[in-house]
């Protein structure tokens, strides 16, 4: 069992983009930015418990940080991990919410 503290550290933020919006509408898939050391099992458990939905599958990828230059100095952005979480039929996560 994963501790509650770890569950809260696994999911960092929802990743909102054109591609993720299309995926949400067509495939019932939500995209999250997750901790770089998070496993698929941890992501699945975190989404299921935090949002109270049933998760079908989780696909992950690591985006490599780009090299950036400012004047004569060069630096590198951090690597980060993204998770595509497919929800069960009929399940939905509303990030926008808003007053009705």
From Swiss-Prot:
- InterPro entries tied to this protein: Nucleotide-bd_a/b_plait_sf, Ribosomal_uL23-like, Ribosomal_uL23/eL15/eS24_sf, Ribosomal_uL23_CS
User: Which PROSITE patterns has this protein been placed in?
Assistant: RIBOSOMAL_L23
Alphabetical GO biological process terms: translation
Signal peptide coordinates: none
Task: Name a GO molecular-function annotation.
Answer: rRNA binding
Q: Which UniProt keywords apply?
A: Ribonucleoprotein, Ribosomal protein, RNA-binding, rRNA-binding
Ribosomal protein found in the keyword field: yes
| Family from the record | Belongs to the universal ribosomal protein uL23 family.
In UniProt terms, what function does this protein have?
One of the early assembly proteins it binds 23S rRNA. One of the proteins that surrounds the polypeptide exit tunnel on the outside of the ribosome. Forms the main docking site for trigger factor binding to the ribosome.
Q: What is this protein called?
A: Large ribosomal subunit protein uL23
Annotated source species: Shewanella halifaxensis (strain HAW-EB4)
Mind giving the lineage of the organism this protein is from? Bacteria, Pseudomonadati, Pseudomonadota, Gammaproteobacteria, Alteromonadales
This protein's gene is called rplW
């Amino acid at each position: 069992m994963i501790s509650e503290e770890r569950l809260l550290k696994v999911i960092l933020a929802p990743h909102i983009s054109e591609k993720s919006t299309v995926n949400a509408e067509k495939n019932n898939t939500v995209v999250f930015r997750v901790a770089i050391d998070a496993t698929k099992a941890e992501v699945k458990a975190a989404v299921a418990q935090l949002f109270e939905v049933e998760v079908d599958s989780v696909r992950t990828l690591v985006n490599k940080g780009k090299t950036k230059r400012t004047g004569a100095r060069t630096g590198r952005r951090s690597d980060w991990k993204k998770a595509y979480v497919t929800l069960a039929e009929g399940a939905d996560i509303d990030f926008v919410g808003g007053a009705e």
